[in-house]
């Protein structure tokens, strides 16, 4: 298990709804059990003798275990408080949430008061610790509810408690809560201010999550995982609601309890014992996963003839998006962001859940309405212990085009089989071409992949980081393929190289800002780095936020600079981050911002609307998106009562021309059959205004003028 990934999960903010918080708690419990088993096994394997490096690893793991336990107990404690309050208000006669932490509190008090019985009490503590709270779900009254409960300490079968015993238990429960509330006050006397502040922040975040849950009816049913959904509650039309299908069955758009969902209906509805086991295995795997890049399982129906899996509804999948004959695929950068989404989801499956997907392909990478990519279809997925391998005795499972050679050859395999599939996905997403179109038969394809080690040709135009990652992922030797943790890190470099076209600009960004999820950087951090490179004060550069800060981030404090915006700025203005030419370019940019005639990067259509009805030669200057490197600026003006547009070209200058053109560029504009050359944009506009070619700067407002064609 990836300890760094686990730490990120523990430190992540809590979900805002009750169902997600319950799943989060269950995931913490699974991680805790896995880490504990790992440490015990390591000690057994070494007969209690461990190296210094192993000792450090174990100590690190124990710290993580402690963090998990602390977070779980905080959640249990707050659930307990919530339900004691509910029971007081509703005269409830059965406690719903029983915190394990409460039981430990009582035992610890007994230990302090009865020194002669230390051994017995310690044994009781150990027994209590082994009985972790259980997550249960229920569907009574058409409402899905969730609870955290403790296993019965005395009986193996549930039974009704006498009313007197229930009341006594409620009194004990309230006393335990009071003891818990008093304990932190005593403990805080021994904590530093920083520790107290962190504790208060943690409690506040959990309280906020609890507050967002709303009031839901609770039940004492003992079901686990996604709820069993009655088939009559899943409503869809087999003729009009079909989303897709394959050998396994079909997927429909449906409605369940008022929510739009996707429902997977296996082709075979009368399942044998082994088939039912396989179906339940898929549901069991899906219910363990809670991650923004994995499709969420909402429930299942296992009634014979009505077998279905219900999950969140997605908009489309990558196969339809990339290979559609009707719509152009998104830009390369957007496609690589989608690949990063997929990598993050698979990294979670491998690192936290120990799940191998086994059928990664574009059709199984779903896209939500907000363009987030999520992993779907766990029909062939398997849980695998860290460091072990699997093999297909009855033949390989998955899709042949994406299948790793070791799987195809029925050799032992592990999670690196998914890495191979991702390499082909990455290639397909980058080229938008179908894989291996020259093969239609399995035998020649098998020979090409397994024996000849054939892979698709990678275009020379690909960034080096992308080429290297693809080649590493589809390496014939599984041991040479990277882990998905490494894949996600390398994808950040790929994103930089695909978002920023200029080599110097990409190097500047990588050196100063590249880090996990570094698609943007706060403006304050960006301007500080830029200031140190060009040796200009940040106060001088601060007006440039109007150009650099992305429009969609205006509400954030200070704003952010995205890689895409940084790339555009580099194309429009050149290497403004260069220590030699940068200061001159940046001063020119600051001067432009002072001019009334500079209208930023508005479109041609908007510029014409602003010029309509204006006097002759009213003008504006705008940044051009058509060819921002060769013709970065456009002069739009009125001529004969109609808008006209004239592009301004830019080209590099020779070394002996630097004194005349200090920005390292010269700008050319056509006029009356001639080409006028200038050292800056402001100089060009001033000269054109002097000779009468341009007159009044255009305001940013529009005049509503009716046209005959309107």
From Swiss-Prot:
MF terms (GO), sorted A to Z: ATP binding; protein serine kinase activity; protein serine/threonine kinase activity; protein tyrosine kinase activity
Domain Protein kinase: residue ranges: 237-495
Catalyzed reaction equations: L-seryl-[protein] + ATP = O-phospho-L-seryl-[protein] + ADP + H(+); L-threonyl-[protein] + ATP = O-phospho-L-threonyl-[protein] + ADP + H(+)
Family recorded in the similarity comment: Belongs to the protein kinase superfamily. Ser/Thr protein kinase family. SH2 domain-containing protein kinase subfamily.
InterPro entries: Kinase-like_dom_sf, Prot_kinase_dom, Protein_kinase_ATP_BS, Ser-Thr/Tyr_kinase_cat_dom, Ser/Thr_kinase_AS, Ser/Thr_Kinases-Pseudokinases, SH2, SH2_dom_sf
Domain of life assignment: Eukaryota
Location(s) in or outside the cell: Membrane
GO cellular component, one term: cytoplasm
Residues covered by the SH2 domain: 597-707
Role description: Required for proper chemotaxis and phagocytosis; proper spatiotemporal control of F-actin levels in chemotaxing cells. Negative regulator of the PI3K (phosphatidylinositol 3 kinase) pathway. Predominantly phosphorylates serines and threonines and tyrosines at a lower level.
Its EC number(s): 2.7.11.1
Region called Disordered, residue ranges: 83-136, 189-232
GO biological process: signal transduction
Binding, ATP: 243-251, 264
UniProt organism field: Dictyostelium discoideum
Cross-referenced Pfam families: PK_Tyr_Ser-Thr (PF07714), SH2 (PF00017)
Key words, A-Z: ATP-binding, Kinase, Membrane, Nucleotide-binding, Serine/threonine-protein kinase, Transferase, Tyrosine-protein kinase
Active site residues of this protein: 359 (proton acceptor)
Protein name (database record): Dual specificity protein kinase shkE
PANTHER family: DUAL SPECIFICITY PROTEIN KINASE SHKE, SERINE/THREONINE-PROTEIN KINASE TNNI3K-RELATED
UniProt feature, compositional bias: Low complexity: 83-94, 107-129, 197-208
């Amino acid at each position: 298990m990836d300890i760094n990934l686990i730490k990120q999960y523990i430190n992540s903010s809590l979900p805002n709804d009750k169902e997600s918080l319950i799943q989060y708690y269950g995931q913490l419990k699974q991680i805790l059990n896995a880490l504990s088993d790992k440490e015990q096994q390591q000690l057994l394997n070494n007969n209690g003798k461990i190296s210094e490096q192993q000792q450090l690893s174990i100590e690190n793991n124990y710290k993580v275990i402690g963090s998990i336990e602390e977070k779980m107990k905080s959640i249990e404690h707050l659930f307990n408080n919530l339900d004691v309050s509910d029971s007081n208000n509703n005269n409830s006669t059965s406690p719903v949430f029983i915190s394990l932490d409460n039981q430990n509190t009582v035992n610890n008090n007994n230990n302090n008061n009865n020194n002669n019985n230390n051994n017995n009490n310690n044994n009781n503590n150990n027994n209590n610790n082994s009985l972790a709270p259980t997550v249960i779900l229920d569907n009574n009254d058409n409402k899905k509810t969730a609870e955290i409960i403790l296993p019965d300490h005395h009986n193996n079968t549930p039974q009704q408690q006498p009313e007197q015993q229930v009341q006594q238990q409620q009194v004990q429960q309230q006393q335990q809560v009071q003891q818990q509330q008093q304990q932190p006050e005593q403990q805080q006397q021994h904590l530093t201010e920083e520790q107290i502040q962190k504790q208060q922040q943690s409690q506040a975040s959990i309280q906020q999550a609890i507050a967002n849950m709303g009031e839901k009816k609770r039940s004492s049913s003992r079901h686990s995982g996604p709820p069993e959904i009655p088939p009559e509650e899943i409503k869809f039309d087999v003729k009009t609601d079909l989303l897709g299908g394959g050998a396994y069955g079909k997927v429909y758009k449906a409605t369940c309890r008022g929510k739009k969902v996707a429902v997977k209906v296996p082709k075979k509805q009368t399942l044998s014992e082994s088939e039912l086991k396989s179906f339940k295995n898929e549901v069991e795997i899906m219910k363990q996963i809670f991650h923004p890049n994995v499709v969420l399982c909402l429930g299942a129906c296992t009634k014979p003839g009505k077998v279905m899996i219900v999950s969140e509804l997605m908009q489309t999948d990558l196969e339809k998006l990339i290979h559609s004959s009707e719509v152009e695929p998104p830009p390369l950068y957007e496609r690589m962001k989608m690949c990063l989404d997929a990598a993050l989801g698979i990294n979670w499956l491998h690192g936290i859940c120990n799940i191998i997907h086994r059928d990664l392909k574009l059709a199984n990478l779903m896209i939500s309405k907000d363009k987030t990519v999520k992993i779907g279809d766990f029909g062939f997925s398997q849980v695998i212990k860290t460091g072990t391998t699997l093999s297909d005795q009855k033949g390989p499972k998955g899709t042949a085009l994406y299948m790793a050679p070791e799987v195809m050859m029925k050799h032992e395999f592990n999670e690196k089989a998914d890495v191979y599939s991702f390499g082909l996905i990455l290639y397909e997403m980058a080229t938008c071409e179908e894989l291996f179109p020259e093969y239609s038969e399995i035998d020649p394809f098998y020979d090409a992949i397994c024996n000849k080690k054939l892979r698709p040709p990678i275009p020379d135009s690909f960034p080096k980081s992308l080429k290297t990652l693809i080649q590493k992922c589809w390496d014939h030797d599984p041991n040479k393929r990277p882990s998905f943790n490494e894949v996600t890190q390398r994808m950040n470099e790929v994103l930089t190289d695909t978002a920023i076209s200029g080599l110097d600009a990409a190097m500047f960004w990588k050196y100063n800002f590249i880090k996990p999820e570094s698609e943007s950087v706060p403006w304050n951090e960006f301007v500080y780095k830029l200031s140190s490179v060009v040796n200009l004060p940040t106060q001088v550069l601060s007006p440039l936020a109007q150009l650099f800060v992305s429009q969609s981030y205006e509400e954030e404090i200070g704003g952010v600079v995205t890689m895409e915006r940084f790339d555009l700025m580099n194309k429009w203005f050149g290497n403004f981050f260069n220590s030699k030419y940068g200061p001159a370019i940046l001063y020119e940019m600051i001067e432009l911002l002072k001019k009334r005639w500079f209208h930023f990067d508005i479109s041609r259509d908007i510029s014409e609307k602003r010029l309509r009805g204006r006097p002759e030669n009213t003008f504006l200057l705008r940044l051009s998106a058509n060819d921002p490197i060769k013709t970065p600026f456009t002069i739009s003006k009125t001529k004969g009562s109609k808008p006209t547009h004239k592009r301004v070209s830019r080209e590099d200058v020779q070394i002996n021309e630097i004194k005349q053109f200090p920005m390292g560029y010269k700008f050319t504009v056509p006029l009356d059959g001639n080409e006028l050359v200038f050292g800056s944009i402001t100089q060009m506009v001033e000269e054109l205004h002097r000779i009468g070619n341009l007159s009044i700067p255009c305001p940013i407002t529009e005049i509503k003028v009716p046209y005959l064609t309107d």
